[in-house]
Design a protein with these regions (language model features):
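Positively charged, small/polar-rich N-terminal and surface patches that mediate targeting and assembly
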Residues: 1-108
Length: 108
């Protein structure tokens, strides 16, 4: 099993913990993510329509592999409340091989 380019973290910001939980539950239930981690409260500072925003958001991190990521991204876009959701695909360059095997086995 090659680690490079096979496993990914999906980094997603959501409007609140409930939205993150809904997306995570659905993704894991549909075997598109092995697991999700939710950071319930963080502060996000950004510009939207040229206006400075300072919002409370939640962070959702989902663990997946290359074959499941396209469907996972599609699901997030469909379930997300934002007009332009933050969805970032972060490659996992290395990790505990047993854990990475568990990710793969969980996505079957």
């Amino acid at each position: 099993m090659s680690v490079t380019r096979n496993f990914f973290l999906a980094y997603i910001t959501t409007k609140n913990e409930e939205e993150a939980l809904n997306i995570a539950n659905f993704a894991v239930e549909k075997n598109l993510a092995a697991c999700g981690n939710i950071f319930p409260k963080m502060k996000s500072i950004y510009k939207w329509n040229k206006k400075l925003q300072n919002d409370d958001e939640s962070l959702l991190i989902l663990k997946t592999n290359s074959s499941k990521y396209p469907l996972l991204k599609k699901l997030i876009i469909e379930k997300h409340s934002y007009e332009v959701p933050c969805i970032l695909k972060i490659p996992i360059d290395d990790g505990n091989k047993e854990y990475l095997k568990w990710i793969n086995d969980s996505l079957i």
